[in-house]
A protein has these predicted regions:
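Short hydrophobic alpha-helical segments enriched in small aliphatic residues
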Residues: 5-11, 24
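Short, Lys/Arg-enriched N-terminal segments with co-localized hydrophobic residues
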Residues: 16-34
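Non-heme di-metal
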Residues: 31-225
Length: 225
């Protein structure tokens, strides 16, 4: 949506009967008002900040996946990688809104270290929480104020995904803290991620009898189809 200021310009001709009137439409690009172009707007800067944040999250989650594998958490590693790919999709959607050139931004980004998997899950959850509770709602509000309703809607939709990311990370962290990654209080079905073997019991086997992969490859059997 583009907003305009309307000015009426009168010009009296040589003949007293000849009065010409022009309606001059001028884009109203003042900060806080509806913008005619993304360039130079607060939303342009916010889109760039969000793009940078999503891009960095993608890399962090890839690093965290490698750490999870080192600790034997194959499923958690796969979830980090899946989420990294989802952050890439967010970044690409935001990047496509930009109109070229250079955009100068001032922003703070996480400069954390790669910790153990429990620490990484909690750090990732905190980042997702900030995005869906603070950053994206504020950026969407500004975008809507400036007339960029499509960008606002996309940011609000991304926030929905980030909320789910946080929940999953917190659930996985809780499983580690409670010793429930490979052990439950009741008999459940465990699936080997490598070959598909199914084991029923309170705890995943030390090694898969079908493919000989270690316990870290087992996950709870779930059917979402």
């Amino acid at each position: 949506m583009i907003g305009y200021a309307l000015y009426v310009v009168h010009q009296r001709g040589i003949s007293k009967r000849c009065n010409k009137v022009w309606f001059v439409i001028v884009p109203n690009d003042e900060e806080g008002s509806i913008m005619s172009s993304l360039k130079g707007s607060r939303t342009e800067r916010n889109v760039m900040i969000a793009f940078a944040g999503e891009s960095q999250a993608r890399n962090r989650y890839t690093f965290f996946a490698s750490q999870a594998r080192k600790e034997g958490y194959q499923q958690i590693a796969a979830i980090f990688e899946e989420t990294a790919n989802q952050e890439k999709e967010h970044a690409e959607r935001l990047f496509r809104f930009l109109e070229g050139g250079e955009v100068e931004i001032k922003a703070a980004f996480p400069a954390g270290v790669i910790g153990n998997t429990l620490e990484n899950l909690k750090a990732a959850a905190a980042g997702e929480n900030h995005e869906y509770t603070t950053m994206y709602p504020e950026f969407a509000r500004i975008a809507r104020e400036e007339g960029f309703t499509e960008i606002a809607a996309v940011m609000e939709a991304i926030a929905v995904a980030e909320k789910q990311h946080e929940k999953r990370y917190l659930d996985l962290a809780r499983n580690i803290e409670q010793g429930r990654v490979f052990k439950r209080d009741e008999e459940v079905a465990w699936r080997c991620r490598n070959c598909g073997y199914i084991h029923v019991g309170e705890e995943a086997p030390e090694r898969c009898p079908a493919c000989d992969h270690p316990k870290g490859y087992f996950e709870l059997l779930g059917e979402n189809y």
